[in-house]
Amino acid sequence: MQHKLLINGELVSGEGEKQPVYNPATGDVLLEIAEASAEQVDAAVRAADAAFAEWGQTTPKVRAECLLKLADVIEENGQVFAELESRNCGKPLHSAFNDEIPAIVDVFRFFAGAARCLNGLAAGEYLEGHTSMIRRDPLGVVASIAPWNYPLMMAAWKLAPALAAGNCVVLKPSEITPLTALKLAELAKDIFPAGVINVLFGRGKTVGDPLTGHPKVRMVSLTGSIATGEHIISHTAPSIKRTHMELGGKAPVIVFDDADIEAVVEGVRTFGYYNAGQDCTVACRIYAQKGIYDTLVEKLGAAVATLKSGAPDDESTELGPLSSLAHLERVSKAVEEAKATGHIKVITGGEKRKGNGYYYAPTLLAGALQDDAIVQKEVFGPVVSVTLFDNEEQVVNWANDSQYGLASSVWTKDVGRAHRVSARLQYGCTWVNTHFMLVSEMPHGGQKLSGYGKDMSLYGLEDYTVVRHVMVKH
């Protein structure tokens, strides 16, 4: 397994403290990797800053060609990446290979095309004798912090738009799941000029803080927890850096009496438990109208009970383990607190799986109330709650009564209601009669404590640029 850092076009061993990297399906240590030292963090940022002088002036065509080459080598090494992701994250191998690798490749190919379509406003005369032009230019060095739930996917979401816009990047994957990012570094070093992409390894305190606080870093992009986002915003405030935050969610799933119940059950069985629920957009907070509440709970409980947890390399496995022992304990604690309320009923699951690995049973909880912690707080595991509601006004208020604002869905056959409710929901994305679907052409990002800024789409590309005005007197 590739375990070296990429700094200024060279693969080098970390000079800091060694950290274990685990296989969550067994609890065994896969390997130990040395963190980047403070000096190596500084070297990576300075390499990116030096490379920006030339990379920032390249044509969109040149940047697009590099991104397309990177997409091709990821596709060619898809099985290798999927196996690394499966071993390091516990993802079912077939899901990593069939779902995630093609989407990752598409992200790089989309931004390769988008790079050639990013334009400023056409020239115009707004003052006599002067011509004004609007430019969209790269910012410089971007520090990108990727999470542990989709290590390679989130690295792609951050690298592709930043590079397409002409920035240079220092990427720090999570210390829990670094293996695919380090493998990506090995392949990228022969495609991009030295210093354009740098990849480090280490914890937030030892590597993340000196990286995000570095004076030559002009932008920090994070996908992570609210607590981490708060820390980075505070940490970078003295240097007034641009920040781009995707900080989690608690997606409301509003099911009206006229919804197609079979479609809801099929959708939540898939979209509520994908990646063992370790996804900020999962369908985890169901609001079911009183006319279909009992039927939905019964049918969904039966469906969730058929989900198979197992070894990641088993083709029949639908749910792998959680990412770490610490996270398993957090998920377990959240469910135990829900049970202790007395009014929440465990329909299925509700316990750790016996044996090795960090497995938690797919869980459905019914009878949850609006103010319950299981409704208000992100669990980030295979846990879905169901809350009964009376009418449209009530459920819209409840759905919006959340610190999160990332994703939501509405299930109804009434087109007017679908439009009406979607317009009132305070979420970055609202799906109607589906959930969880993402495409490279459409933006992904939240409101409120879910953060700000967009991933994917032309809006995502614009987030990695600065708008400039050039005026010429003639």
Swiss-Prot record:
Gene name per UniProt: patD
Residues annotated as the enzyme's active site: E246, C280
Record's miscellaneous remark: 4-aminobutanal can spontaneously cyclize to 1-pyrroline, and 5-aminopentanal to 1-piperideine.
A Pfam entry, by short name: Aldedh
Residues involved in NAD(+) binding: A146, P147, W148, K172, P173, S174, E175, D209, S225, I226, A227, T228, C280
Gene3D superfamilies for the chain: Aldehyde Dehydrogenase, Chain A, domain 1, Aldehyde Dehydrogenase, Chain A, domain 2
Pathway(s) of this molecule: Amine and polyamine degradation; putrescine degradation; 4-aminobutanoate from 4-aminobutanal: step 1/1; Amino-acid degradation
Organism of origin: Escherichia coli O157:H7
GO MF term list: aminobutyraldehyde dehydrogenase (NAD+) activity; NAD binding
Similarity comment: Belongs to the aldehyde dehydrogenase family. Gamma-aminobutyraldehyde dehydrogenase subfamily.
Subunit structure: Homotetramer.
Catalysis performed (reactions): 4-aminobutanal + NAD(+) + H2O = 4-aminobutanoate + NADH + 2 H(+); 5-aminopentanal + NAD(+) + H2O = 5-aminopentanoate + NADH + 2 H(+)
Protein's UniProt name: Gamma-aminobutyraldehyde dehydrogenase
Transit peptide among keywords: no
Biological function: Catalyzes the oxidation 4-aminobutanal (gamma-aminobutyraldehyde) to 4-aminobutanoate (gamma-aminobutyrate or GABA). This is the second step in one of two pathways for putrescine degradation, where putrescine is converted into 4-aminobutanoate via 4-aminobutanal. Also functions as a 5-aminopentanal dehydrogenase in a a L-lysine degradation pathway to succinate that proceeds via cadaverine, glutarate and L-2-hydroxyglutarate.
Any one GO BP annotation for this protein: putrescine catabolic process
Enzyme type, top EC level: oxidoreductase
EC identifiers of the protein: 1.2.1.19, 1.2.1.-
Keywords: NAD, Oxidoreductase
